Amino acid sequence: MEELVSCHHLPLLCLQSSVPPNGCLTFFQDSACQRCSHSEFSNGHPLNDVSLQNDVAVNPIVAKSIDPSADLQLLPLLESVKEEPTLSIIVVGASGDLAKKKIFPALFALFYENCLPENFTVFGFSRTEMNDEELRTMISKTLTCRIDQRENCGEKMDHFLQRCFYHSGQYNSEDDFSGLDCKLKEKEAGRLQNRLFYLSIPPNIFVDVVRCVSHRASSASGWTRVIVEKPFGRDSDSSRELTRSFKQYLSEDQIFRIDHYLGKELVENLSVLRFSNLVFEPLWSRNYIRNVQLIFSEDFGTEGRGGYFDNYGIIRDIMQNHLLQILALFAMETPVSLDAEDIRNEKVKVLRSMKPLKLQDVVVGQYKGHSKGNKSYSGYTDDPTVPNNSVTPTFAAAALFIDNARWDGVPFLMKAGKALHTKRAEIRVQFRHVPGNLYKKTFGTDLDKATNELVLRVQPDEAIYLKINNKVPGLGMRLDRTDLNLCYSTRYRGEIPDAYERLLLDAIEGERRLFIRSDKLDAAWSLFTPLLKELEEKKVAPELYPYGSRGPVGAHYLAAKHNVRWGDLSGEDS
């Protein structure tokens, strides 16, 4: 329900029964009051409980004939109309790791910062048998007042937990979702219902849950939105089929496909850095940028998740979504506005300007066992949940190109891997050499020192730094490369919000800028599907690399093929 218009602070009353076709009747003292649309407020549902309170007549009423004293009889009803809508957040898959480690803590952080509406409840739904108190005990183990150390932290935590409830059921049972709906209505108490469902479940049961939500648990008077976690299919065909199935039950604006990397602080800051600083925007093209590197590395392997990971691999898990979405944000043209659709339109244009990846532009690897000191690290296929003959890549590097006037000829290099020497995620922009550089003899043949580089470190230790050439103090002429460094932990006090906090708040507010639209998803899959099919059909053997190393040697040859050196492998960044 939209907010009711008022005249002299007297709210409108919209009665559905026997209402003239041109809209709802308005109680007014001023002829300037406007009518409200009948469909806007009723949402097509029968007369609601609020309208039936206090024996209010439902026959046509002529506004001008109302006795002013009748206003007193309507005050309880008018007060109920003014109540804030309820917000019900339903975490489907509440007993899973993602819900416990990320979703519930993010919701508590939003509550802690007073970002949730007054009338909110959180419901957990899963197959696990549990009651409300058991859910609260489970949630409480992962909640922390990490933002700061206010004295009322414990009190806030207790208040949040009292808003948390649980309903057990099967994901494909409409009856179980009807039971959930009854519990939701009990908490909503006849007020306007807004419902947000977070699907923290395996993708093979997405459609069952969406069907049950649509048929039995959607809001009768407000909005219903569904957040969907990746993976969104395995290739173009399965992704399109998933989207088609969703749209049998939901409209596109109800579907919030989440990629939590787009909620990272440094990724969010990327467009601000570019479009609000004159020093960068003129340089953002092939004229000044030599290459762009998007790097994701983890210093641990699959460790127990091998069975799940083996079905997808590093390309589907990281490159096709996280890194490609960041690339689109980095390379897009200036949008008309900051409106969600304007930004998403520009990102889709970037993806459609790219050619599908070919096998010769990709290197795949898989980590093997390695001993370091007195400690031994198991290889990928040593995991008991992984087939011994698996060729699923745990590392991939790729070179992509954008065929448009801004980026023609600029290689965009992606690299993602597990069990590497460090954990990091960053965007590295290497600029071209200075034409006719007066100091080139001082640099010698060291390519690194001759190149300016802008680095956005997404994690850990968020930072933005620009590598520049500088004279070392002294009598001689010796040049050194140094950093102009913005380290977030030094410059800004307080902890940076988690990506899930930002994205959950955006979904609640209906802000879609950081969520993935269906056409963008389709464009992303079209780039990687031919490559994935070729890898699987030919059973391409990945290059082995030791656990804890810098990855397969082939990645260096791929970069050298495009006259690039990986920026994260220089001595100063190791």
Curated annotation (Swiss-Prot):
Residue numbers annotated as active site: 322 (proton acceptor)
Record's subcellular location: Plastid, Chloroplast
Residues annotated to bind NADP(+) 2: 415, 424, 428, 457, 465-467, 550
Disulphide-bonded residues: 145-153
UniProt note on regulation of activity: Regulated by metabolites. Post-translationally inactivated by cysteine-mediated redox modification via the ferredoxin-thioredoxin system in the light and this avoids futile cycles with photosynthetic CO2 fixation.
Protein's pathway: Carbohydrate degradation; pentose phosphate pathway; D-ribulose 5-phosphate from D-glucose 6-phosphate (oxidative stage): step 1/3
Record's subunit section: Homodimer.
Role description: Catalyzes the rate-limiting step of the oxidative pentose-phosphate pathway, which represents a route for the dissimilation of carbohydrates besides glycolysis. The main function of this enzyme is to provide reducing power (NADPH) and pentose phosphates for fatty acid and nucleic acid synthesis which are involved in membrane synthesis and cell division.
HAMAP family cross-referenced by the UniProt entry: G6PD
Membership in a protein family: Belongs to the glucose-6-phosphate dehydrogenase family.
PANTHER family: GLUCOSE-6-PHOSPHATE 1-DEHYDROGENASE 1, CHLOROPLASTIC, GLUCOSE-6-PHOSPHATE 1-DEHYDROGENASE G6PD
Name used for this protein in its record: Glucose-6-phosphate 1-dehydrogenase, chloroplastic
Provenance organism: Spinacia oleracea (Spinach)
GN (gene name): G6PD
